[in-house]
């Protein structure tokens, strides 16, 4: 299903289609920007306050679960399908109803508060812990513990997140700001 052709002036229609495709997207479960691609939709489960940026692909042959507050950057692929490693096992086999290739799927679970940055790929069978960051372009093939930053191909844990990572908004951005009333008068 592609929501690419559902323009902003059809916002209600887009939301109805999305809720039909992904029932957990109802009631604030997710904000999803088009285009969005998925295989089935019914195997995708959103917690509250999830955000999915544009051009994401969710191949949901098995369940994909995003807990509360998960952010997914642009062009991310979350793919549950897996294929055999050996080439002769990947070849289509003849069955009574025709030729088929061997494919199986493993679920993916992403913990609350995690952020999957742009162009990352999450492979089947992976569990990403709570409050994790998956760096842009990373390919996650193994489980990620809570409160970690992972990056690379394949993704590896760079370090644990801690209190020193907390953004100091006042010190960083507001310290040298001039109050609005003085700025309007042109004074510093």
Indicate where each model-derived feature is located.
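C-terminal/domain-terminus segments
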Residues: 121-151, 155
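Arg/Lys-rich RNA-binding interfaces used to dock onto structured RNA substrates
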Residues: 29-35
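A generic membrane alpha-helix/interface feature
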Residues: 93, 148, 170-172
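Flexible, glycine/small-residue-enriched loop-and-beta-strand segment within the central core
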Residues: 36-46, 51-127, 153, 160-162, ...
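Aromatic-residue hotspot detector
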Residues: 23, 35-36
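Terminal amphipathic alpha-helical/low-complexity segments used for targeting or macromolecular assembly
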Residues: 1-29, 85, 153-188
